[in-house]
Amino acid sequence: QRCTSTRRLIIHESIYDKVKDALVAAYKQLRIGNPLDENNHVGPLIDTHAVEMYAAALNKVVAEGGKILVEGGVLSGQGYESGCYVKPAIAEAENSFEIVQHETFAPVLYLIKYSGEVENAIEIQNGVAQGLSSAIMTNNLREAERFLSATGSDCGIANVNIGTSGAEIGGAFGGEKETGGGRESGSDAWKI
């Protein structure tokens, strides 16, 4: 539900299956429950409307031709009475899918395969209306520099070898394109 959560993973075809298999295995180990219990990884969504949006996203990705790899769903029973606990889902998708272009604040991860050079991944990454946070995982310094360059990631936050979530304390925080309304914190907070 964080605005900086990873929702699209753009993976090179040479490692796609390996990454996909590792993610599917990891998701099967997630514990869902009371967020105050340190043994749990995932808490509830904010309200039942968020649950409806989550369910609609899963239905939409399938309707558009995507493939569910880790089945989602709403949990019920003891400890889940609120109706707001859902299973994190993974779906294979295309960046052109309408649902992938839409920001869903729920645990749905879209896997998108790319081929060729890192520029192709950057083009896919930049091919949405949102632009808050991005990250690249690479051992190649040139790819990292390309991602961080003026013609690379068009997000307000661009990270290398760390996730998309989080922000630097005291650093400017904000996005590009349809994301956010300017910068919060940092030196931008003093500007009028």
Language-model segment annotations:
Residues 1-3:
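Extended low-complexity, polyampholyte segments enriched in Ser/Thr/Pro and acidic residues
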Residues 13-130:
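NAD(P)-dependent aldehyde/semialdehyde dehydrogenase
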Residues 31, 81-192:
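Conserved C-terminal structural/oligomerization subdomain of aldehyde/semialdehyde dehydrogenase
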